[in-house]
Amino acid sequence: RVGEMMQLAKPDLRVYIRNGMSAADQVSREIHENEVYRLIRHHWMMEVNLTEAPKVIPFPAGIELRPFVREAQEYLVFQAEDEAFRDHWGHVPGNFNNWKLRKIDREAFDPTLWHIAWDGDQIAGYAQTRYRNEVGWIGNLGVRRPWRKRGLGEALLLHSFNEFYKRGMLTIGLGVDASNPTGATRLYQKVGMQIAVEDVIYEKELRPGRDLESEE
């Protein structure tokens, strides 16, 4: 069956099997290691439990939040997200229709939980948040490269915390690659988030070739 699936990939592409599991699941980890899978990544779910209103910090000069307007802005947000995540592990250029179906065309979608930071007519950063299993969930937090290292990510994160706090949601979580190249884990720890769950990702290469994840 694996051979049949490989035939679906273009002949020049790298093919691999990738599985994730709890870091504490020693049985599954040993099975994968015995089958010559490589440990390639650690993934954290981080949480914070709010006991008081989070602090508020100003947004960088020239940056303002505007309400998310679905039809007018959804493609712009898609583009901003795709750009912001180009240097993240596992990134593959996205497809707008699939993105829209997964994120916006959902019955539970609440546009007031999407916080978009603008610099003039350019999206500088965003926080896409939602409710997930009784937790306020930061589904995606991103800052485009020209606006990094100015405190925008922290301002967006704390703004999201405050919006959840106002709605009575005191537990807030997110998922992050433990080796995130933009320093996201340091930011999350700075605002009081702690590791709640750690997963590991194993990979076994079936065929070498061109890797879509390494291309922009």
Q: Where in the sequence are the language-model features?
A:
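Conserved hydrophobic beta-strand within the GNAT/NAT acetyltransferase core sheet
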Residues: 17-20, 138, 172-176
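Conserved N-terminal entry element of GNAT/NAT acetyltransferase domains
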Residues: 49-71, 209-216
